[in-house]
Amino acid sequence: MSIENLHIADETEIPAGATVELHSRPERKARKALEGLGLKRVQGIQRVTLRRARNVLLVVSSPEVYKSPGSDCYIVFGEAKVEDPNSAAQLQAQAQLAASSQAAQQAHAHGGFKEGVPKSLEELMQDAPSADSSAPAPSGEATDASASGDFKVSDEEIQLIVAQTGVDEAKAREAYISEKGDLINAIMKLQ
């Protein structure tokens, strides 16, 4: 038997599929020092959030949490990451805007949004009423169009604002009109 074929079973060998947590030396020392305090491990905690000044959050995902039996003192082990809720809201709004614009482009590529929506400028010009004839419009849609300026208030967009913010339709419509038809700004205004 040669040296190359010799396999010595190491006691620290980890079997495949096992989950083992490797700790740094300072963390091992801290854990050993805390063992003597009689701390009890708290199960079922998935995330710990610590709020700092200027609305900055320190977030520990999948932490190990221990509680001191004599007081309300908790010790948290894990990797803390800085999270800014303002930037998270902006990123979420940008992602939502990108998704909605992509959906609009796909709908336009498939021939329009709804039945009766003109697919081209020529069709729109053919369907346009002449400047001489001014027939009265239905009362419900006319008030929305006149109050909102040049854009059309869509019930689908109002329902989207209601779903995203949880406010009633009147507040959603008011925010949508005050933001001049900008869906993202209306949602951000109500949150």
Curated annotation (Swiss-Prot):
Keywords: Cytoplasm, Nucleus, Protein transport, Transport. It holds the Pfam family NAC. CDD domains: NAC_NACA, UBA_NAC_like. It is found in: Cytoplasm; Nucleus. This is Nascent polypeptide-associated complex subunit alpha. GO terms for molecular function: phosphatidic acid binding; phosphatidylinositol-3,5-bisphosphate binding; phosphatidylinositol-3-phosphate binding; phosphatidylinositol-4-phosphate binding; unfolded protein binding. InterPro entries: EGD2/NACA0like (IPR016641), NAC-like_UBA (IPR044034), NAC_A/B_dom_sf (IPR038187), Nas_poly-pep-assoc_cplx_dom (IPR002715). It comes from the Eukaryota. GO terms for biological process: cotranslational protein targeting to membrane; protein transport. It comes from Cryptococcus neoformans var. neoformans serotype D (strain B-3501A). Residues 126-149 are annotated as: Disordered. Part of the nascent polypeptide-associated complex (NAC), consisting of EGD2 and EGD1. NAC associates with ribosomes via EGD1. GO terms for cellular component: nascent polypeptide-associated complex; nucleus. Belongs to the NAC-alpha family. Residues 24-89 form the NAC-A/B domain. Its main location: cytoplasm. Residues 153-191 form the UBA domain. The keyword Cytoplasm applies. Residues 127-139 have a biased composition (Low complexity). The keyword Aminoacyl-tRNA synthetase does not apply. Component of the nascent polypeptide-associated complex (NAC), a dynamic component of the ribosomal exit tunnel, protecting the emerging polypeptides from interaction with other cytoplasmic proteins to ensure appropriate nascent protein targeting. The NAC complex also promotes mitochondrial protein import by enhancing productive ribosome interactions with the outer mitochondrial membrane and blocks the inappropriate interaction of ribosomes translating non-secretory nascent polypeptides with translocation sites in the membrane of the endoplasmic reticulum.
